[in-house]
Amino acid sequence: MNNKIKLIKEDITQLEVDAIVNAANSSLLGGGGVDGAIHRAGGPEILEECYKIREKQGECKVGEAVITTAGRLNAKFIIHTVGPIWSGGNKNEDELLSNAYKNSLLLAKNHSLKTIAFPNISTGIYHFPKERAAKIAIQSVTEFLKQDNQIQTVFFVCFDFENLEIYNKLLQTYK
């Protein structure tokens, strides 16, 4: 199981995988952090596709996910998911964050994708506690992979050394 999960510190926009996950906001129109970086690196076609999705379904709800092509990125697709804003833990944040991971994996599976890369969802400007978020991420992905063997590799892509150390420590308990 754990050989399907890889931990790296990289620029997620540079990865050659089937899908990178964008920690988007509900508007799907780009923003700060990884969301802004993906939109800038991928080019305007990503935003155009996001507008089309909004026309069909409206905003993307917290915990849900949608898929677009990847524009100029090396990845084939971008899965945009909306993580929860941390509000002290009393507003279903854990379940919503778990759903963001699970729904992203489900979209990848439904599109026959084999490699997917996740950023540290909700841990930036949404202020989700990093260790708590990492536990939820690892648990959600591990549970999904137990039920599905189509997805071959899941990358947890850490932006900083703090998240890298947290994930590295927690992944040891899943070996």
Swiss-Prot record:
One Pfam family hit: Macro
Protein family membership: Belongs to the MacroD-type family.
Domain Macro intervals: 1-175
Record's protein name: Macro domain-containing protein LA_4133
Superkingdom of the source species: Bacteria
